[in-house]
């Protein structure tokens, strides 16, 4: 009696089919990930390459703009030195660094031009070497000259206050520069007060000479 044919186990077949399908899905997914990673790396490479090209072009344009600006400033400086106006250049793109550099240079030039003068550079508010001679005033450059010129008149000798003004003028011209140098921060009125104090005690003061003569007698 022949053996009865036994068919394939249905459950085993289904399990193998599912396993094969899952493997196929996993393989397809893994392959897709590999391809995506490849194209992603390729995209990054392209982007980096494009960025480098863009940066290079940007630097080239900035260098060109700086060169144009430097040339314009050089021509402008040459024109100022020669005293000839130049034709204004067409406005060009200037970088922020160039603007800051130009402003910094202008501020330095302005600071140098506005540097405060020292007391030696500032002229006296009153020219002590040029005075208008008033009626009856004797012109003298030194105290000795003033006294010699005025002592020729016995009338004036009897009245030293009349030659006081000329003697004080000579005294002021001699001593004011020294007082001003010793006190550079004082105003002219303060300097004159110091000068007057010295004058009141000075032997060159005709009034002091009169007192000295009287005391000697």
Curated annotation (Swiss-Prot):
Disulfide bonds: none annotated. Keywords: Coiled coil, Cytoplasm, Cytoskeleton. Residues 18-45, 52-74 have a biased composition (Basic and acidic residues). Residues 1-95 are annotated as: Disordered. Residues 45-115 form a coiled coil. Belongs to the CCDC124 family. Associates with translationally inactive ribosomes in the nonrotated state. This is Coiled-coil domain-containing protein 124. It comes from Xenopus tropicalis (Western clawed frog). The lineage of its organism: Eukaryota, Metazoa, Chordata, Craniata, Vertebrata.
């Amino acid at each position: 009696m022949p053996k009865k044919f036994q068919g394939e186990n249905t459950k085993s077949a289904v399990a193998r089919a599912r396993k094969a399908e899952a493997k196929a899905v996993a393989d397809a997914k893994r392959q897709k990930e590999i391809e995506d990673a490849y194209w992603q790396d390729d995209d990054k490479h392209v982007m980096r390459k494009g960025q480098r090209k863009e940066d290079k072009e940007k630097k080239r344009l900035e260098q060109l703009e700086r060169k144009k600006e430097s040339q314009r400033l050089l021509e402008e400086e040459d024109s100022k030195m020669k005293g000839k106006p130049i034709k204004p250049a067409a406005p060009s793109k200037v970088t922020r660094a160039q603007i800051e550099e130009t402003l910094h240079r202008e501020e330095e030039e302005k600071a140098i031009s506005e540097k405060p003068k020292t007391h030696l550079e500032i002229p006296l508010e009153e020219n002590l070497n040029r005075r208008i001679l008033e009626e009856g005033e004797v012109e003298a450059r030194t105290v000795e000259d003033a006294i010699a010129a005025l002592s020729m008149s016995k009338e004036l000798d009897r009245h030293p206050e009349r030659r006081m003004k000329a003697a004080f003028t000579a005294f002021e011209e001699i001593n004011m520069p020294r007082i001003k140098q010793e006190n550079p921060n004082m105003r002219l009125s303060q300097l004159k007060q110091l000068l007057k104090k010295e004058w009141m005690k000075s032997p060159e003061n005709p009034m002091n000479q009169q007192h000295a003569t009287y005391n000697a007698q």
